[in-house]
């Protein structure tokens, strides 16, 4: 009885080790598909990174350049070439609008790039997104006091600022436009055609 129990435990242990080995192996393979953000970005990395990972790799590389001095984000980003500026700003816009709409974009530090974004979007070939963002910028400037009136620094105040917010219509338009003209694909195509602009 004791011998068969010991054999069962050993067998189970071996099975667990084999499963862990294969599980870890798969995780390692997945992580190897994405270059470390600690390495300089090279043409080879851009060429060998899949389309679904390229934007993240480039953004990570750009964000790493900010990390030590994030409080100077605006100045640092504007010191980059136009291509890097565009990808960084568009990624911020897309993340904010997809998470909480244009209202959240303007509320957070990403809003500091609002005026520069239409040109950045045009640069990468996203002209319809540029037009949409110009209209959202114009509405925000005209309706700023109404939009920000409830934003008192509390979660409740920010949540209340979505009620009857004139920016809400732009959120819906952004989502529908992105279904037709994928903004991430537009950026990936731009990066591939202009890869020297992104290498370190």
Tell me what each language-model feature is.
Residues 21-23:
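C-terminal motif of bacterial Sec signal peptides marking the signal peptidase cleavage site
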Residues 25-27:
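Bacterial signal peptide processing site
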Residues 2, 105-106:
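A generic structural signal for short
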Residues 10-18:
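Hydrophobic helical h-region of N-terminal Sec-dependent signal peptides
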Residues 32-88, 94-99, 106-113, 120-200:
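Extended, alpha-helix-rich binding/interface surfaces that flank or overlap catalytic cores
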Residues 2-11:
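Bacterial N-terminal signal peptides that target proteins for export
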